[in-house]
């Protein structure tokens, strides 16, 4: 889950000037000075908040102490984090979806997710499987909508694991549709027209029957 952020609006290179300049910008190295702290507090910024600390951490990682920032730039960056200091996804406005080195392994767990989300994924997977003749078309798929709908139903701490779980169910459904298409026409290959009615007997319950999401893999090159 890569993310590119332009911090040009936060920084300006300036050499041979004082720590706080005439237009209200200040060197990042001066953030903890009493004068800058007074400016921040006067602007309504809680410098003890996790939101502020997350923003400053990001600023410092993107620049260095000799670079400049300003009050509005800090406020703008703070708006990218929630009160717990967690990054807010700009696409869906939800926190708890940033994959880091710390949570990379812990997110890979199967948890209970709403049946409505599984049903939504089943229906979409079937629709797109038929429309694209089994091909995964990244240009036309609406998978992201299903995942975002799921994330809104989950608590922040469970969103990554919920997405991981739904991905496993998606694989189960695709495998079931592939197997059904092959059963209806043993000569069928991905990208070729699927025999009419080939998937009619594949219900969500049947696809999930006897399948463990934790072990879901694709046996085919779908």
Report the location of each language-model feature.
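Type III/flagellar secretion export determinants
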Residues: 1-222
